[in-house]
Design a protein with these regions (language model features):
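Periplasmic alpha-helical coiled-coil/stalk elements that build and connect Gram-negative outer-membrane
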Residues: 2-6, 129-246, 349-352, 356-359, ...
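Acidic, low-complexity, intrinsically disordered peripheral segments
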Residues: 3-6, 30, 404-466
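Sec/SRP-type N-terminal targeting helices
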Residues: 51-55, 68-69, 105-133, 158, ...
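A short glycine-centered flexible hinge/capping loop motif at secondary-structure junctions
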Residues: 175-179, 381-385, 422, 426
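Metallo-beta-lactamase
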Residues: 202, 252, 408
């Protein structure tokens, strides 16, 4: 019953603040309108950091190809031109063409471990990319709400400046009429100056937030943006324990950590293979043509099965095994640490979300009451019944109440997004579609990078000469 009542209070409060603050959103001319959904899709389709992570898939796939190739047939061709002269013999000259093929029959389990490790690595690379997409989504959400929150706080500070400016004019008129002391004029001027400084800080915070958002979206860093999505209160009914259980099942970075543990176990198997023999099948053929002292041609075909066994290496193999076992145990502990971090971070974000929810509920009537208090204090002062301190206190209380309401509202939105991210909530279908548009490195980009490197090197050399 209490939670349902609080939910209704939050919904009404969110709606009221959204309506009151939407009227004050800055709307620069010729700015690009951007919803939160559009911002997320743009980032998933163009973020440079995400492109870097995605390239790791190519690297992992290439490593898997190498591992499979080492367990398959390899062939070599050679051509040798030879000349020799021995004492009391005629000079000899010949040319030999050779072709050989080699197939590993048994590697002690090393090749098989390498292949399985490569397969796990390729899958882990894809999981890492997907987790990077989820993290990027959260970063965009947080940056978007940071910018919207900053824009609303600008209006609070601008309203404060306007009120202090109007009050200063009123006090000046009263002072000129002999109804107020000069100290009231001076104090009002100081408060106006302080309010203007707070406005400058708020405007800078907004500019920094937009710069962060543009960087995530990888758009023109001077692009004017109009953020059009209004945050709406969405109840979150999942318990913290259920959130943690969900995260243990769905966090992709935890899956990557577990996969790394398996790869370390395979590395132990690979190191132990050094104690076992290796068996290889080799087939070869060759043609030798002799030019001096006479012309002659001969061919040969060979087949062999070779066994190699490292019976003593002064402890090198034993050391490799111990190193691999240590790395395996480190990976095991890293999985445990990752699980503990998930638990802690989720609990912190969850508690912060609930705290922001309660703060917003408690600020529901504070803004209305602060406005009424300011109006009363201002009218009492104009009538000569109040003192300047009453107006200053009332204005400070009003600005604080407005700022607290805005902060609580956007803190809740950010912490909710963080909780969902820490749970490992997957992307939507439309977000996956946007992520599929992420481009690989193009030939034009490589050429431009090479040109920039050459130009930069030339400039550096020229400066060194000077």
């Amino acid at each position: 019953m209490y939670r349902e009542k609080r939910r209704r209070q939050c919904c009404r409060a969110f709606a009221a603040l959204a309506l009151s603050t939407a009227l004050f959103m800055p709307l620069p001319a010729h700015a690009m309108s951007l919803t939160l959904t559009e911002a997320i899709d743009m980032a998933l389709a163009s973020n440079t950091g995400l492109r870097i992570t995605a390239e790791g898939e190519r690297s992992a796939d290439a490593a898997l190809k190498q591992a499979r190739g080492k367990n398959s047939i390899s062939a070599e061709a050679g051509d040798t031109l030879r000349t020799s002269k021995s004492k009391d013999e005629d000079a000899q000259a010949s040319n030999t063409l050779s072709l050989s093929a080699r197939l590993p029959l048994y590697s002690g389990g090393a090749n098989e471990a390498n292949i399985e490790s490569g397969e796990i690595g390729a899958q882990s690379a894809r999981l890492t990319t997907e987790r990077a997409r989820e993290d990027l989504k959260y970063e965009v959400i947080a940056a978007y709400w940071d910018a919207v929150e900053a824009s609303k706080k600008i209006e609070v500070q601008r309203d404060t400046v306007n009120k202090y400016d109007a009050h200063l004019k009123n006090v000046t008129v009263l002072y000129d009429a002999g109804a107020q002391a000069k100290i009231d004029v001076l104090r009002s001027s100081v408060e106006l100056s302080n309010a203007r400084q707070e406005l400058v800080r708020a405007e800078n915070t907004y500019a920094v937030s937009l710069a962060t958002l543009r960087n995530l979206l990888n758009i023109d860093r001077t692009e004017e943006l109009t953020l059009t999505t209004e945050v709406a209160y969405q109840p979150f009914d999942t318990s913290v324990d259920n959130c943690i259980s969900y995260a243990y099942r769905n966090r992709l970075d935890l899956a990557v950590a577990r996969a790394k543990l398996r790869r370390c176990e395979l590395a132990v198997e690979r190191a132990r293979a050094g104690k076992r023999p290796s068996v290889n099948l080799t087939l070869g053929t060759g043609v030798t043509s002799q030019f001096q002292p006479r012309h002659d041609t001969s061919t040969d075909v060979s087949a062999s099965v070779g066994v190699s066994w490292n019976i003593f290496d002064s402890g090198v193999t034993r050391g490799a095994i111990e190193e691999a076992e240590a790395e395996r145990d480190i990976a095991l502990l890293n999985v445990k640490k990752e699980e503990e971090s998930i638990d802690l971070n989720l609990r912190k974000a969850y508690l912060n979300m609930r705290e922001a929810e309660q703060r917003f509920t408690s600020t529901g009537d504070a803004v209305r009451q602060a406005r009424e208090d300011y109006h009363i204090a201002n009218e009492r002062y104009r009538a000569g019944e109040g003192i300047l301190l009453d107006i200053i206190d009332a204005q400070t209380a009003l600005a604080t109440a407005q700022t607290n309401a805005i902060s609580a509202r956007y803190d809740y939105a950010r912490y909710r997004a963080q909780v969902e991210n820490l749970m490992g909530t997957e992307l939507t279908e439309s977000e996956h579609a946007a992520a599929e548009r992420l481009p690989a490195v193009t030939a034009e980009e490589r050429a431009a990078a090479q040109a920039a490197y050459i130009e930069g090197g030339t400039d550096a050399a020229a400066k060194k000469v000077k």
